[in-house]
Amino acid sequence: SQSVNQGFDYAEVAEIIQKIKKYDSFLDDEYGENALEMRNKIDEIEDLVQKEENPSRIKALLNDIKNLSIGVTGSLIASGIVTLLSRV
């Protein structure tokens, strides 16, 4: 599948998701009602990265997480997530 998805860095995405997951216990406080949506998107990304498939769906999910994080004001965790995702 390397040639099919050339140019998509699954390892980098996996690393970013691991970093985001370290803050899981803070998601409820920081994201409120969007915490569950965040977790669902993180789980779906993890699944796709593990299978190394559907990079366009992964990018869309990462963008959703970024947008959810941008909507959280005054949160160091959310702004850190936005910064992490700007690398992808």
Pin down the residues of each PLM region:
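Short amphipathic alpha-helical segments that predominantly mediate membrane engagement
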Residues: S1-V72, L84-V88
